[in-house]
């Protein structure tokens, strides 16, 4: 008698396996959402932090913008060491370096064959040096990427403003792109046109920065010669990156990596991006570790504190932007020891804060998982990979990730990253922590009223007072399409002391300060009445901090003992003051005066000068 096997359970199991396999095959990957980054943009955004190095004749003339007639003989550093620059930048957490190969004065840090206004006519190395080449080699040696800043504006060149200068400009750009290896970024400054030396004419030349340089042709040359480079351009044709509208070191708490391909870009779009833009143009936050971009000994006591640098990090990298942090080269040809120590301390603090992700020892679940597939499970957000992500089903634009700690846990930082290879999606989210038996809403303490839990992008970091909780809910309240979250992090950052203002400064609150003018030009001057005559030798002007209106860009300074008879002390330009509204310092031979008047010969916008503070240096 034959034994008849019961195959029903086996067949059921095989059918179940086949069904699961079929379901797995039917779960498609999410479609892209709007514009997405190209390979170069993605690589740049993944760098997060890289250094700016400002170095030129300005270093030795104590200026921010050279006029173009400065003597190359002043350029003779005694301790110049590009390897020290690179070691410092690497220790400060920077992944690359951008050098000001030529600033507005026109002086070149490489021996360009197209001009005599370069280091080949300086005493340094008897004119045989090449700082661009030396730095490119040092970056390669230490594993950092290298890039160049080339100012389109050249206040030295006789042909600036004429068609022949564009050829000169491209010839110099070609030298930089073909002689120094791979370039990760080409940086074109937005300052274009104005007064200058211009071969000895000493005149003002204005250009249309959108058309004069013929940017499309220049871009084609860059793409051909350096196909891995991104282009930063605040002066014309849309580049691969955008300026964020300020040099103070912050971008908007809402920050879309999108703009339109063409058209004007108002300040709001620079700072916040454009939610429905048709081009991927991420923000790059550029700021200096000192008030100015070039080295000034007077700023040795004004290097950004550790707490200020961390604030800058949270408001740039932590808001879906890269951070381009400037280290000015000092007169010895080195990154100053003060700047170096502060930059390295900054890197160590970032490492300390983000080295221990508390979420990786917790359990994470999601309210929705795409197709219930392990490929898109919530566990992906704590696997330390940028190539995996949690995804929700199509049509789901609200979802929650819940982090359950194995014991009450103290934390004060939350980090999230979208899988931006498929676009930027999330437009609003919230955080709630289970403290005891109560759910508590967490607010961003770096934003007024805690608002601003909106966009995420490449990385978003939220700071809040330390709490002790057993669960944390990351609630996505709105998303353009199904949300894709690559990583989340929960951290406990140490407390940092707040900045303490410098002591001993004599501020304008001690004086009578009024805005005055004439019948023809009302409100053009700032008048300081010290109530009695004093010996003065300096004047400081702090522009308005929350508006671009009323900023004095060109000035004259006058003194008087009686308020009727005035003597001009000095006049000139406050370079780059609109973009970087820091203290503007004027020093002069000690003179006796009761009244000081700062005239706004030109102001940025509006018809009335404005100020945040005034300081007078009174001789004792």
Region spans (language model):
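Bacterial N-terminal signal peptides that target proteins for export
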Residues: 1-10
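Bacterial N-terminal signal peptides
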Residues: 11-19
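Sec/Tat signal peptide C-region and signal peptidase I cleavage site
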Residues: 20-24
């Amino acid at each position: 008698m034959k034994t008849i096997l019961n195959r029903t359970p086996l067949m059921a199991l095989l059918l179940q396996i086949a069904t699961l396999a079929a379901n797995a095959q039917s779960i498609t990957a999410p479609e892209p959402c709007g514009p997405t980054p190209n390979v170069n943009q993605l690589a740049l955004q993944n760098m997060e932090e890289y250094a700016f190095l400002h170095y030129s004749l300005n270093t030795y003339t104590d200026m921010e913008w050279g006029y173009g007639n400065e003597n190359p003989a002043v350029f003779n550093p005694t301790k110049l060491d590009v390897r020290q620059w690179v070691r410092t930048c690497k220790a400060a957490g920077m992944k690359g370096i951008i050098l000001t190969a030529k600033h507005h004065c026109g002086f070149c840090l490489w021996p360009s064959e197209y001009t005599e206004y370069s280091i080949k006519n300086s005493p340094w190395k008897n004119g045989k040096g090449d700082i661009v080449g030396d730095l490119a080699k040092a970056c390669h040696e230490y594993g950092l990427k290298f890039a160049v800043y080339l100012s389109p504006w050249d206040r030295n060149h006789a042909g600036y403003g004429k068609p022949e200068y564009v050829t000169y400009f491209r010839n110099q750009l070609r030298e930089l792109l073909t002689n120094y290896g791979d370039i990760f970024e080409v940086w074109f400054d937005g300052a274009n046109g104005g007064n200058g030396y211009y071969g000895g004419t000493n005149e003002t030349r204005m250009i249309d920065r959108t058309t004069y340089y013929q940017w499309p042709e220049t871009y084609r040359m860059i793409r051909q010669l350096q196909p891995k480079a991104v282009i930063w351009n605040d002066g014309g044709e849309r580049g691969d990156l955008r300026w964020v509208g300020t040099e103070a070191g912050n971008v908007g708490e809402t920050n879309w990596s999108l703009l339109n391909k063409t058209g004007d870009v108002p300040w709001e779009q620079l700072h916040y991006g454009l939610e429905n833009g048709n081009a991927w143009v991420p923000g790059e936050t550029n700021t200096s570790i000192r008030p100015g971009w070039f080295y000034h000994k007077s700023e040795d006591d004004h290097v950004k504190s550790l707490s200020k640098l961390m604030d800058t990090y949270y408001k740039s990298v932590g808001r879906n932007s890269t951070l381009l942090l400037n280290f000015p080269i000092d007169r010895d040809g080195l990154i100053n020891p003060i700047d170096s120590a502060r930059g390295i301390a900054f890197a160590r603090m970032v490492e300390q804060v983000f080295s221990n992700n508390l979420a990786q020892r917790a359990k994470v679940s999601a309210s929705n998982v795409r197709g219930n597939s392990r490929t898109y499970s919530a566990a992906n957000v704590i696997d330390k990979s940028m190539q995996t992500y949690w995804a929700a089903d199509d049509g789901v634009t609200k979802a929650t990730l819940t982090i359950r700690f194995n014991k009450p846990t103290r934390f004060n930082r939350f980090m999230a990253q979208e899988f931006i290879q498929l676009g930027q999606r999330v437009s609003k989210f919230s955080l709630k922590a289970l403290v005891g038996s109560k759910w508590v809403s967490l607010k961003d303490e770096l934003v007024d009223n805690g608002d601003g839990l909106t966009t995420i992008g490449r990385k978003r970091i939220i700071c809040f007072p330390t709490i002790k909780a057993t669960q944390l809910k990351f609630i996505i309240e709105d998303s353009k399409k199904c949300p894709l979250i690559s990583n989340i992090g929960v951290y406990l950052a140490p407390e940092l002391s707040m900045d303490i203002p410098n002591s001993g400064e004599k501020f304008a609150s001690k004086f009578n300060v009024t805005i005055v003018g004439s019948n023809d030009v009302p409100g053009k001057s700032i008048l300081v009445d010290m109530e009695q005559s004093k010996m003065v030798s300096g004047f400081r002007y702090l522009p308005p901090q929350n508006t671009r209106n009323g900023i004095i860009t060109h000035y004259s300074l006058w003194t008087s003992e009686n308020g009727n008879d005035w003597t001009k002390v000095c006049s000139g330009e406050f370079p780059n003051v609109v973009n970087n509204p820091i203290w503007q310092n004027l020093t002069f031979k000690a003179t006796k005066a009761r009244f000081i008047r700062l005239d706004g010969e030109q102001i940025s916008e509006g018809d009335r000068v404005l100020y945040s503070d005034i300081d007078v240096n009174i001789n004792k």
